[in-house]
Curated annotation (Swiss-Prot):
Enzyme class: hydrolase
Organism: Aspergillus fumigatus (strain ATCC MYA-4609 / CBS 101355 / FGSC A1100 / Af293) (Neosartorya fumigata)
UniProt protein name: Serine/threonine-protein phosphatase sitA
Reactions accelerated catalytically: O-phospho-L-threonyl-[protein] + H2O = L-threonyl-[protein] + phosphate
Amino acids binding Mn(2+) 2: D161, N193, H243, H317
PROSITE patterns, alphabetized: SER_THR_PHOSPHATASE (PS00125)
A single cellular component GO annotation: chromatin
EC code(s) of this entry: 3.1.3.16
Region Disordered: start-end pairs: 86-146
Note describing how the cofactor binds: Binds 2 manganese ions per subunit.
Function text: Protein phosphatase that acts as a modulator of pkcA/mpkA activity involved in the cell wall integrity pathway. Plays an important role in regulation of adhesion, cell wall integrity, biofilm formation, and virulence.
Cofactor(s) the record lists: Mn(2+)
GO molecular function: metal ion binding; protein serine/threonine phosphatase activity
Amino acid sequence: MVDNKIPEPGPAKLKRNAGPDEWLEAAKDCKYLSEQHMKQLCEIVKEYMMEESNIQPVSTPVTICGDIHGQFYDLLELFRVSGGMPDGSEAEAPKTQSAVITSDDIEPPSTISDPKLRKKLRNTFAPEDGSEDSSASQRDRSSSSGSRDVELKRNFVFLGDYVDRGYFSLETLTLLLCLKAKYPDRVTLVRGNHESRQITQVYGFYEECFQKYGNASVWKACCQVFDFMTLGAIIDGRVLCVHGGLSPEIRTLDQVRVVARAQEIPHEGAFCDLVWSDPDDVETWAVSPRGAGWLFGDKVADEFCHVNDLTLIARAHQLVNEGYKYHFANQNVVTVWSAPNYCYRCGNLASVCEIGDDLKPTFKLFSAVSDDQRHVPVSRPGRSEYFL
């Protein structure tokens, strides 16, 4: 049985002259906007995005979020774990147990190689007596370590793949666009490989829009927003955020800054590589099994970070069971994954990565909210269709 306080999905019932404030409140409640309001929202957000650089500068403190994939109720949990939405509303306690992992806990190159740390995670997410106290202590730890960050107003960088596969792609994207419209300087939406016309026609977002509106006009408006999403973000000039990875055509950040981004994602080239590439155990470059982008190795990452004076490349794009993963011994590439129990069947943890002014990453891990904390659409696609 679903808790009656849980946001119930459905169409928003707003006056015709409603604006961003009303849209945001409706979006928080898992309501999708009318066709008219959604198109207005897309135009507002598009105007802000047109002014952004291909690599948008962002100041610390920052919360970096990975793939969401239409998992609306887990996105709400992400905000609870992160201390609240950018609107400054009072943060709720997480519905699931969470853990805080700092860079001091990590032994390269594996994500979690320390047996003590593995035990810590196992104990944190195991349903044991006293777990509530454990969760509270974790929150105390994170709140005390981040109190200065709260005062400075935390920024959010989302690394793309907001839609497809999950049950509520439209509502998820609507909430993020509303936050962008209301707080344009505090929310950065990076483009992922799923923010494209071709991919969304295959993996669910197009079909969802058509089902809810009876036509494709809102989907088209959202795709125009996708075209203006930034290709990356740079935190305090030292931490690069992209969806996928690096490109053999890109050696410097200035080369990214001059890429023509206001278009559908090309099938090859630098733009394509930024949203499709993956780090892997290769020396330099290798052909990607995805059919787009490249696999890049530690030598490539080391050189790119050296040339561009970077301490870290934060990216998403790949499911990692423990919520995040460092890929190389130098710990200069990390995957952040923010869709727990991906496709409602993978059983994985999720994380957000918090970067303070010392530029040391702290990971907050969380799991999917329980069934009584979410709604499931009656006419939902079969899970096998989405697990592609």
